[in-house]
Amino acid sequence: AGIYLYFVFLLPGETYTEPTARRWLFAGCAAVAALVLYLGFPRLGWTRSGLLAALTLAALHRLAIFLPEISTTPWSLGWSEGSRFYNASLFFSRSRYGVAAPTPVLHPTRYLLQSIPFLLSDLPLWFHRLWQVLLWLTAAFASGSLLAMRLRRRGAALSGTVPVLALAAWSFIFLMQGPVYYHLLVIPLLLLWGVQTNRFWRT
């Protein structure tokens, strides 16, 4: 995994920016990782070792994409980054700007989640960027993990920790394809965590 991430994200030049080269590199590194898993845990078998290696590598790739977004640069990392942080700050407009400004009408849940760091004063810009990255990652991975645990409780063929982690990783990758925004996962998270047919009031 480390070799793959180095060649894709750290190696100078554009050798592995071409999709075909990147696919071959991914397949080769996944095959080596699958072999290591199979030799270390023969009970997994070739199929599970291969799937687990590919899922792990893909999840790490998706995680690594977020690292440049935790930047200390004062310049905007995207055309709407500044407005998103400003909209988030409006939930605390009186303490920040001395006036009671209206809260955002568009995507209020997103900006409410992003506003949490504004509870603390004088946090640097990189912390707000880190917080947004954590929202992306935790919402997607928590959704996958809760889904896997729910299926396991309902008697699905998810015996052991490895299948649960594999399903959680696959769900994380699936949700990040779009990606599905973290504020849209709040309700699925509540449903996956809270709904239990044998606990009426909690449900």
Name the predicted role of every residue range.
Residues 147-169:
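Transmembrane-helix signature of polytopic, membrane-embedded enzymes
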Residues 170, 183-200:
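Specific aromatic-rich, kink-prone transmembrane helix
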Residues 25-38, 138-142, 185-192:
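Hydrophobic cores of alpha-helical transmembrane segments in multi-pass inner/ER membrane proteins
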Residues 9-15, 129, 162-185:
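Aromatic- and kink-enriched transmembrane "portal" helix at the membrane-lumen/periplasm boundary
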Residues 104, 120-141:
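Loop-to-helix entry region of an early transmembrane alpha helix in multi-pass inner-membrane enzymes
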